[in-house]
UniProtKB/Swiss-Prot annotation:
Its EC number is 6.1.1.7. GO terms for molecular function: alanine-tRNA ligase activity; aminoacyl-tRNA deacylase activity; ATP binding; tRNA binding; zinc ion binding. The lineage of its organism: Bacteria, Bacillati, Actinomycetota, Actinomycetes, Mycobacteriales. The gene is alaS. It comes from Corynebacterium glutamicum (strain R). This is Alanine--tRNA ligase. Coiled coil: none annotated. PROSITE patterns: AA_TRNA_LIGASE_II_ALA (PS50860).
Length: 888
């Protein structure tokens, strides 16, 4: 039975039983604490936690969820049961049926006849486990289902009691195992041999409330839940392994085709030895996981999800090399795994080209460094062993990472294969030093000095109270003054200083929003604030010029925000949120923010996406954004707990460190809801027009949109309109006809250029006919050493040389033709077949000429070309060529 049929039978079984079929969620959810969806119940957590009401008609649902677990990537292939990507088929009940219903449903599907839509498993080969004290489940299995008592085994909390690891719902579980037979191990059930007895289904009975505690079995159970729920998970790949009667999950119809392709590409047979088999399984597993991650929008990177994907793809590449592959292999692996997975995930077909491009690009980038990096490691390993050591120094591991892009995980793998350890502490120390230097450089740029310890007393004792959400002018006290990184007691006119206030309405740069501009006032004293930076998350540092008067520590002042600056900054920041929401509408939920910067009237927004946006997509994003502006939605903010914000549906960015209290900015209800600490307009209409300037790539898998907002947008659009009107006037055409008229002009220009090029070539050929008259005979070789008219390009020189060579026919002939082209000296060398037979070699002659004119080049024996920079050396070069021909 093929895997896609197993999936269909599972879904049909539960739909026929009244469950609502729910499509698999993306592997990427808006949860900053979750790298990937790693269990079938994850998308249903809000319903189990009581944060949302289940929207399913009968209170029951079924899904086959994509899952990725990457805790033990290096163990993949060593064991044959576990995959980094797997499909978890589940049925869920929210206060409807409980233990008996869950057990009956699972047993009916597993043992039901194939003709009736079941899997047809032999009931005599099924074993079950229950929690130690769960007499109810044990009785259902024995009395209602008919499983003999000797095939029902009881296990403790660590094995058969489920919780989320935090306070919340929990309960006992019951697992179903399949006996694969005596060839796989000893008898005695799952407690005796979990290799012979394969777990295929876990039934979780959520009936209790978990309290605080640590681990799987050390927590308090507080009492019963008001509603009892069911969460089950059947391993699709494991059931496929059983129904297809293969040794392990790697030999099912989903993964074995990749292994077959790997055999062909590497010349190594699967099953020949254990080490090779592990590498084959790594290729198969990681190809599927990598492909599915790219499908859901992950791109290779150096941290978070992108780092996991990069690590998987690079392990594929290295495993293929170790098996004997010599060229690129990613295209074949990806094509194969996409073929096997498309029946279950039809969306792969529409994303095939994108998936291939991301994977192959990563392969080509890594192959450039793999050979040299591996060679460096092998040299290091040899010298380490020769010195009687068993440890790779942290500096050596750091060099591999810093110079060749080797992740520490790859170095650890290579070291283990060589019987060595790695000084991970030393590596981490060097990485920390590098980060510290980068941080110091950044601090120096922001503060003019790198020593931030000078701020410690204020950070610890007098953090700044930010008042800028409530007011734009605040009564403040000067707590400190600094100049050139040193504390001072007073500041005088003309001095550049940093001012520490007890409270401030000026926004400090963070979250992509630049710091406010404004003033600090005391009588006639005026300090112009041109930047505000944060130290940590608590202290505001106002960088200011004393424009008039003086200021001392302890003075009572008024801190005032430049209202025009703040208004325009608010416009840009709120526009950033709208553009983010519009992007996700147009491109899908994987277009996640990767960075942003907004300042008055301008914003840029970086997002994870591998494709260049089409003009139509850019226009659609702009239209959705401006429609949101025009709708005049209220911009609401609320401070709440992180858990409550997530329950509300607020978007959080993976990898960000959020405090226990967060600020949610909501625009248009579900249209945009993000965690954000920045300043915003009160209504979306206050943003004014938003004009997208375009989008571009700023790195692998990251693109950038830039836009104007408010008055800047109006001015930009006015200039664009004036430009269009001027062009329309010049072309004597209405504006709406400009694209067509410009296209016509471009076509005419191209036609004229082709005509000019044809005339040029005709003239060139006419001149070429007489050039052989300048040839001389040197030792029986017709030799033409010629500088043609200036600004003849390399292509034309090549045409001249090949034409003249053809004219020489069977004669022995050598041609060297050069030109002075705006300070560069392109040149071509050609030799007839007869001259080559005598010993002439155009490639060698190119190198000879290049040595006289500060140039280089190369090519074949009959034709080569090069370029130099010293036309004055050309005659000497010709003389050297004559000498070479005389010596033939």
């Amino acid at each position: 039975m093929q895997t896609h049929e197993i999936r269909e039978r599972f879904t049909n079984h539960f739909v026929n039983a009244g469950h609502q079929a729910v499509p698999s969620a993306s592997l990427i959810l808006d949860d900053p604490n979750l790298l990937f969806v790693n269990a079938g119940m994850v998308p249903f957590k809000p319903y189990f936690l009581g944060q949302q009401t289940p929207p399913f008609e009968n209170g029951t649902a079924t899904s086959i969820q994509k899952c990725v677990r990457t805790l033990d990537i290096e163990e993949v292939g060593i064991t044959t049961r576990h995959n980094t990507f797997f499909q978890m088929a589940g049925n869920f009940s929210f206060g409807q049926y409980f233990k008996e219903g869950a057990i009956t449903h699972a047993w009916g599907l597993l043992t039901g006849s194939v003709a009736d839509g079941g899997f047809g498993l032999d009931p005599e080969r099924l074993w079950v486990t229950v929690y130690l004290d769960d007499d109810e489940a044990a009785e259902i299995w024995e009395k209602k289902i008919g499983v003999p008592a000797e095939r029902i085994q009881r296990l403790g909390m660590a094995d058969n009691y489920w919780s989320m690891g935090v306070p919340g719902p929990c309960g006992p579980c019951s697992e179903i195992y399949y006996d694969r037979g005596e060839k796989y191990g000893k008898e005695g059930g799952p407690v005796a041999d979990d290799n012979r007895y394969m777990e295929i289904w876990n039934l979780v009975f959520m009936e209790k409330e978990r309290g605080q505690g640590i681990g799987k079995d050390n927590f308090e159970i507080l009492g019963d839940l008001p509603k009892k729920n069911i969460d089950t998970g059947m391993g699709v790949e494991r059931v496929a392994c059983i129904l297809q009667d293969v040794e392990n999950v790697y030999e099912t119809d989903l993964l074995r085709p990749v292994i077959d392709v790997a055999e062909t590409l590497t010349g190594t047979k699967y099953g020949s030895d254990n080490t090779s088999d592990i590498r084959f399984r790594v290729i198969a597993d990681h190809s599927r996981t990598g492909m599915m991650l790219i499908l859901d929008g992950v791109t290779p990177g150096n941290e978070g999800r992108g780092y996991i994907l990069r690590r998987l793809l690079r392990r594929i590449i290295r495993s293929a090399r170790l098996l004997g592959a010599t060229g690129e292999t990613m295209e074949q692996f990806m094509n194969t795994i996409m073929d096997t997975m498309t029946p279950s995930y039809p969306e792969i077909a529409d994303n095939r080209e994108r998936i291939m491009r991301v994977a192959v690009t990563e392969e080509r980038a890594f192959l450039k460094t793999l050979v040299s990096g591996t060679h460096l490691f092998e040299e290091a390993a040899t010298s380490i062993k020769a010195a009687g050591s068993t440890k790779v120094a942290g500096a050596q591991a750091f060099a591999l990472h810093d110079t060749y892009g080797f992740p520490i995980d790859l170095t650890l793998e290579m070291a283990a294969e060589a019987g060595l350890e790695v000084d991970v502490e030393g590596f981490d120390s060097l990485m920390a030093e590098q980060r510290s230097r980068a941080k110091a450089d950044s601090q120096a740029k922001k503060h003019g000095h790198t020593d931030l310890s000078i701020y410690r007393e204020w950070v610890d004792n007098n953090p700044t109270v930010f008042t800028g959400f409530e007011e734009l002018d605040s009564q403040s006290k000067v707590l400190g003054l600094l100049s050139d990184g040193a504390k001072i007691s007073e500041a005088t006119e003309g001095q550049e200083v940093e001012v520490i206030l007890d409270q401030s309405p000026l926004y400090a740069e963070s979250g992509g929003q630049l710091g406010d501009r404004g003033q600090i006032l005391l009588g006639d004293t005026v300090l112009d604030v041109h930047d505000v930076q944060k130290i940590g998350k608590k202290l505001w540092v106002h960088k200011a010029l004393v424009a008039n008067g003086g200021l001392a520590v302890g003075d009572e002042v008024v801190a005032s925000v430049d209202k025009q600056w703040r208004h325009a900054a608010r416009q840009a920041h709120t526009a950033t949120h709208l553009i983010h929401a519009a992007l996700r509408q147009v491109l899908g939920p994987t277009a996640v923010q990767a960075g942003s910067m907004n300042k008055p009237g301008y914003l840029r927004f970086d997002f994870n996406y591998t494709e260049q946006l089409t003009p139509a997509q850019v226009e659609q994003i702009q239209a959705i954004t401006n429609e949101a502006v025009d709708t005049d939605w209220a911009v609401n903010t609320v401070e709440t707990s992180l858990e409550e914000a997530k329950a509300m549906g607020a978007m959080a960015l993976f990898g960000e460190n959020y405090g226990s209290t967060v600020r949610v900015v909501e625009i248009g209800g579900p249209f945009s809801m993000e965690l954000c600490g920045g300043t915003h307009v009160a209504h979306s209409s206050q943003i004014g027009p938003v004009a997208l300037l375009g989008e571009s790539s700023i790195g692998s898998g990251v693109r950038r949109i830039e836009a104007y907002s408010g008055l800047n947008s109006f001015n930009y659009l006015s200039k664009e309109r004036a430009l269009a009107e001027g062009l329309a006037s010049s072309l004597k055409a209405p504006s709406e006809e400009l694209p067509e008229r410009v296209a016509q002009l471009v076509d005419k220009l191209k036609a004229a250029e082709k005509e000019i090029e044809a005339l040029h070539r005709q003239q060139l050929m006419a001149q070429t006919a007489d050039l052989l008259n300048n040839a001389q005979e040197i030792g029986g070789v017709t030799t033409l050493l010629l500088r043609v008219k200036d600004n003849t390009n390399a292509g034309d020189l090549r045409t001249i040389a090949t034409t003249l060579k053809d004219k020489l026919g069977d004669r022995e002939g050598v041609l060297v033709i050069a030109s002075d082209n705006a300070g560069k000296v392109p040149f071509v060398v050609a030799a007839t077949k007869a001259a080559v037979a005598r010993g002439a070699h155009s490639g060698n002659l190119v190198k000879l000429v290049g040595s006289y004119i500060d140039g280089r080049g190369g090519g074949k024996a009959d034709l080569a070309q090069g370029s130099g920079a010293n036309i004055a050396g050309l005659e000497s070069a010709f003389g050297a060529v004559r000498a070479e021909i005389e010596a033939l």
